[in-house]
Amino acid sequence: MPHHRLDFNVNANSFGVLLFFLTLTICFISGCAPKEEGPDNVAKVIGSMTDSLPIISLPEDADPEAPDWKGVDLDPKSPVKPSYPAEEAKQFLLPEGYHIDYVLTEPQIEQPGAISFDGNGRMYVLELRTYMLTADSDGTLEPVSRISRWEDKNNDGVYETGTTFLDSLIFPRFVLPYGKDCILTMESDADNVYKYTDTDGDGVADKKEFFTNKYGRSGNVEHQQAFMYWGMDNWLYSTVNAFRVKETPGGVIREKTGYNRAQWGITHDDDGKLWFQGGASGVPSYFQFPIHYGTFKVENQFAEGFEVPWGAPVKIADMQGGMDEVRQPDGSLNRVTGSAGNDIYRGDRLPRELYGQLFYGEPVARIVRQIKPVVSEGLTTLHNVYQEDKSEFLRSTDPLFRPVDMVTAPDGTLYVADMYHGIIQEGQWAQKGTYLRTKIEQYQLDKVIGLGRIWRITHEGNERDKTQPRMFDESPADLVRHLEHPNGWWRDKAQQLIVLSQDRSVVPELEKMVRESKNLLARFHALWSLEGLGALDKVLVGQLLKDQNPRMRIQAIRVSESLYKDGDKQLAKNYSLLMKDTNTDVAMQAMLTANLLKIPSLRDDVTKLMTSNSAKGIQVLGEQILNPVEIRGWMVDKGPELTASQQEAMERGSIIFNELCVQCHGLDGTGTPLGNGTVMAPPLTGSPRVQSHPEYVIKTLLHGLEGPLDGKTYPGSIMVGMGDQSDGWIADIASYIRLNLTNEASIISPEQVSEVRLKSKAKIGPYQYHELLASVPQNIAPSDRWKVTASHTAPTRIGGTDSPSSAFNFEGWTTGETQKKGMWFQIEFPEARTISEIHFNSPPKRRGNYRDRIPPFQSYPRSYDLQVSLDGANWNTIKTGKSDSADTILSFEPNKTKFLRIVLTDDIEEEGEIPWSMRQMKIFGLLQNEKLLN
């Protein structure tokens, strides 16, 4: 909230002085305060509520004796009215000695979903301004959300100065500060992550750069990926996605990980282990082992009673599951049903017993839970610290308290983001006739929108640290000193900025800290800083593998994985030896690393270890390493199903890659390292180029490629053409690269290679990069200048945009009714351009509920004409076709057109309501003065 300076000029006569002090006294007695600037959002919400109490009836299909309805109170009720922040603060219940104060509220921010700090202590707020504005999710995907940035310039503990760093966003998924005046973020239903930078210092991003692609997922806004998070290992992780990404001098690379099954929240502990937060499960989702080792199943991870929340009485019983989830008589939640935001508290200004414990929000229960992790025989069990008291760390009697994120702050305290919102369930589960919808209407919860607060939790006797970070003004050498700070936030941020700087002048100082510091955590961060700078010394790592402290040995094992991938295969002997370590945690870490890297002696080593060490963790890991079971992901695409012949092609491609390509591109496709952060050849992992049009890879393999690539020059500056190889050989290696190394593209057939070989037979010598791009159809980014229309359109999901232009993203477009002859979808370009291909996906549509086994219907167009026009009046049909699968590719001779239209040519003959749907549409054309989609 802003602080206001009261300026006055009192005449020095007795009447003026008397009047001034009389006014001051009245204000003191009555508690008056300076009037808030800007709109009064609380008053606006209250004003939107009806004075006549809604009359609520039992829905027609509801069974009053069913568990979710039995005993429901449907009497008319007064609306749940929002409180001002000072009044909400009085409704919190905290353990003795703790205090909570707001640091930022509406109207400055609205509907905060996450918070994060940059190197100067400025707080970025992810404002999800379209979340549940109505019970039907209307407007969720409108471009009005934002990321704002806030500062406490006068150091009074309140963030009074802010800017809208990035505006007009479609439900952004995360905000990650990424260096000075720079963030990473992406929007819902999108596939690309972008880097936004403020280049002129006005607090508003003015530069947008592509960072990485293939990051998105389909689904409603609750089920898409979120929370890009910088781990201590210098990789970037996110919820949902089973991979991690990392920016290197050669580009952004990616590696596969296990399935984290998380929705909203990632944090890490002092040892760098990530803790993922589940959503609908209401509990942490994956936390036993670092996620990049895969997903291992562990039983009994939660103490008895863990799934029972102990919120304060809220009385309104607005739980999605109905009356059987309501604790009587206080109306609170009796079993966790949602969770959001998490933090391993690593600050230095709260009681020491909180350090290293997990905090997360349960916004349906209106609680923040404190978790004590208990490790026994290498496995972790989670305990609610206040379980015996039937309580929680933070509770509220205000039904609108919605804790959705929390972080250890630069001042050493704990911050909580409170959306302070009426509805906290996506509209798909709040439809007419549901129990939740009944409660929403009964208490007018849909009216409570546009609010939000950020809270600071402190403890008496522990003043917040008023040292304001100024890391952007410091040298890398200054940053190294912060690695010894008692507050984990300072250590994490200093490491991140050291790595982003790529300034190797601090390597000697970092190596000295690793060897000599008395601060174990500083040694950890210094070691990972060296890794991030590409400056790991084999001798140093070898010494650390024998360190007296087992936690240091574990870090040395993890960091050595980078050296192993860079070719130091002698480390396999160390891993075998460390599996015999007397410390169970060290032995388990050696198992995990050996399994990840698939060292030759893995099975023998693990079998011997399981025989000699009976610890539960050893047995659980060993059994699943020796006898792996398929672990299903959650909301994660599996990739294309391969036929037997295609799988054989993959195996042949793997042999080619490992015999030939690894020499320059490295075993994992990240480029063979040459030291000083350079690699021999461009990374192939997660490569936008490799995953683009098939002709790019085919032409490169046939004819070769030389010179700078995207402005970067590599020591192995020429890729020799292999046109003397057969079409099948080219197809095998091209397919392997496009479907492995964390790439997710299409398989390539020998017939495709033959066609490209024929088209490019006149080419002599290797391509230059710009020349290759000019010859390959490019995926053209959709523009706001494109006019996209359709004969029929309907939302593809509850809260959808009902817009044909959604065909270009994960939301998709649909006719909403059965396919009929004459239905059309049209694109009008700003000016005529040459196009040659159209790709789109038509997802199967489920019918019935999950209990029914009704096969889904296929929504691809059964028969169609592809038409083009230069004036929108005279049309030519350039292709006639029939789709028979979810993925449709329309290829044709390059054609210059201003209008492009797909028209259905027949009525559908199948039974049932089968609309036409398209999503992730891609238009390919020749290079033009138009932005290309990376």
Model regions and ranges:
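The canonical Cys-X-X-Cys-His
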Residues: 406, 417, 454, 653-669, ...
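Structural detector for internal amphipathic alpha-helices that build alpha-solenoid repeat scaffolds
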Residues: 465-469, 491-502, 521-535, 540-546, ...
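Sequence/structural segment immediately N-terminal to covalent heme-attachment motifs in c-type
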Residues: 647-672, 690-703
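Flexible coil segments in periplasmic/lumen-exposed cytochrome c-class electron-transfer proteins
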Residues: 62-79, 634-648, 654, 714-784, ...
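Beta-propeller domains with acidic blade repeats across secreted/periplasmic ectodomains
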Residues: 34-478, 489, 499
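Aromatic, loop-rich ligand-recognition surfaces of beta-strand-rich domains
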Residues: 805-934
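Extracytoplasmic electron-transfer domains, predominantly the class I c-type cytochrome c fold
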Residues: 156, 448, 678-747
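Post-cleavage N-terminal segment of exported redox proteins
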Residues: 35, 386, 458-467, 532, ...
